[in-house]
């Protein structure tokens, strides 16, 4: 975001839930139901701690809420492997407590409704966490093909594609940066002639170039510079990246 998004989490203690993992990781159940059960029981267990009101509630006062008094982001990690079954059982996802209902976090005040869950093992993996926060915090869509029947999608060049590498996930692509208000663009036309500078750092960071398809307000080409440094160290290549954007497409 180049400093336009500041995101700070309050980390609580580990808690042991009242049911075995097999209860929450029921692969015959929709992942949203299992996630709701996990998050609700985790919050109930946390709030039952003797020092909850004196120790954690004062920290939670700093959390940002929306107009409904819902905390804008709640991250829950569960130990061990995920279900391995797409969207079933304990599958990492971002959603809300549609089944359990909003849960009170502070007495008469802030509530938990949006959440994301991610499995955590013995590695400092942040890729899935970052991807799911793209959904929860920023409203970013998935930019990969759900049924893998085409070669479309953003691939490893976007966090919301397949760029959520465990230890060092890729940046968000130019399209989503601009949609989030993190970027500026220069509009190009068929008669444009300019010497453009694209950079992964410095004054031109998050500045892109757009050529609109004639007669369309939702389809265009977007150019950015990507380099194998920082969050992009794992990219297969670097240089000028030109995206073909169709905002009315689906995955």
Predicted regions and their residues:
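Extracellular hydrolytic enzyme modules, especially secreted metalloproteases
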Residues: 73-237, 243-248
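Active-site-proximal segments of metallohydrolase catalytic domains
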Residues: 1-108
